[in-house]
Amino acid sequence: MDDLASAAKGQVAQRDGQAGFNDAGWQIVAGNYERFVTQIDAEATSKGLWRVNGPLTAASHPYDRFARSFDHATGKVAMHFDVHDDLLRSHVGPVRLSVTYLDRGTGTFALRYDAAGDSEKTAFTVTKTETNAWKTESIDVTDWAFQNQGPRGADLQLVSLDAEDDIFHGVEVVKQPAEAMPAP
């Protein structure tokens, strides 16, 4: 908290007149920033992080402010996500799945999704290379089902494949035009 006085004044006062950054406040919507992709039981399955790379400065990456991570010490080794049922009404065409993560350490994680015939299909596996940069991994998939058949009723899962506490900024789902997929 950089400006305690502004934090007690509410959202508009914080936006218009605070000095520095406040990562908490009063009368602020609880939970993750989300739209159509909701983390299932976020507090029980992951750890919230703030100011990931230290104090925020003009040189800080925008993703440094808020993130979520695995926490092996407390058994939080998989995050589960529900894609809102009305987001993708037509099950035709490709969907791009993207994960933004901090490339810190050399650990490995996977993104899994609810596919036709496989509710825990691996979309991709990432092995980090210790650049300490924010990176985004994406893949277009055509066999997605998103029928809430994964663990905890999930459509998407981030799963730790080792003992590192991987750090994530976001998960994104974007419907692609049919021509976005390369020909077989």
What are these model-predicted stretches?
Residues 82, 98-100, 112, 140, ...:
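Residue-level recognition of well-ordered beta-strand positions that form the cores
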Residues 86, 100-105, 144:
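Solvent-exposed strand-to-loop "edge" motifs in beta-rich extracellular domains
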Residues 138-171:
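Extracellular beta-strand ligand-recognition surfaces/modules
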Residues 118-150:
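Extracellular carbohydrate recognition and processing domains
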Residues 88-98:
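Extended extracellular/luminal ectodomain segments enriched in beta-structured repeat modules
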Residues 2-88, 117, 172-174, 184:
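Glycan-recognition and processing domains
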Residues 107-120:
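Short, surface-exposed beta-strand/strand-loop-strand elements in extracellular ectodomains
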